[in-house]
């Protein structure tokens, strides 16, 4: 257990130089109607993307934990996905794997722990309370059917508000890749738990 916490500390030392996103939500943002034809066409496109990969950089801040790392995300379905974190200052890696029987977290030193409850395992090992099952959709800019969301003037997802386990998450999609209209810089916040997740996606594969 201590080894995992030590690994998290290695990630933490690079937080100041990582993810140049502002921690504060943008203001005075203009939005357009959700019925916009270009947005609806894009929404249909990303809804068809069932499995995909994303690579980039991630920064996480909470009252008790903070770390920054490179990441590789591979998503197949809600019971099959992996998130690999790479330290920016060492060779340390952390692999989070979701499978049929639950979640397994392991590091490059051979330490490993599994549990049926993925949420509790993430909290115990990493100190992170982020709903990865929802992140799969948030990352590609696909709002849930019951989410309160806004469409930007670029005809892409601009922001959303979503309730998970009694707390409220907000997301702001700050920039998109020009070649495929997939998210580039995303700011996720949960004010009730004081968590901030800053994501920069450098590469999309789908």
Curated annotation (Swiss-Prot):
Q: Name one GO cellular component term.
A: cell outer membrane
Q: SUPFAM superfamilies in the record, alphabetically?
A: Prokaryotic lipoproteins and lipoprotein localization factors (SSF89392)
The identity of this protein, by name, is: Outer-membrane lipoprotein LolB
> What is this protein's function per UniProt?
Plays a critical role in the incorporation of lipoproteins in the outer membrane after they are released by the LolA protein.
Keyword Transmembrane helix among UniProt keywords: no
Q: Which Pfam families match?
A: LolB
Q: PROSITE patterns under this entry? A: PROKAR_LIPOPROTEIN
Q: Which residues form the signal peptide?
A: 1-18
By its UniProt entry, which Gene3D superfamilies does this protein fall under?
Lipoprotein localisation LolA/LolB/LppX
NCBIfam families, from UniProt? lolB
Keyword annotations from UniProtKB, A to Z: Cell outer membrane, Chaperone, Lipoprotein, Membrane, Palmitate, Protein transport, Signal, Transport
Could you tell me the superkingdom of the organism this chain comes from?
Bacteria
Single GO biological process annotation from the record: protein transport
- Answer yes or no on keyword Transport: yes
- Which coarse location class applies to the principal site listed for this UniProt protein? membrane
Q: How does it sit in the membrane?
A: Lipid-anchor
Q: Which gene encodes it?
A: lolB
Known InterPro entries for this protein? LolA/LolB/LppX, OM_lipoprot_LolB
- Where found, per UniProt? Cell outer membrane
Where a lipid (S-diacylglycerol cysteine) is covalently attached, the residues are 19
Q: How does it assemble?
A: Monomer.
Q: What does the sequence similarity comment in the record state about its family?
A: Belongs to the LolB family.
Q: Give the positions of lipid attachment, kind N-palmitoyl cysteine.
A: 19
Which HAMAP family has this protein been placed in?
Answer: LolB
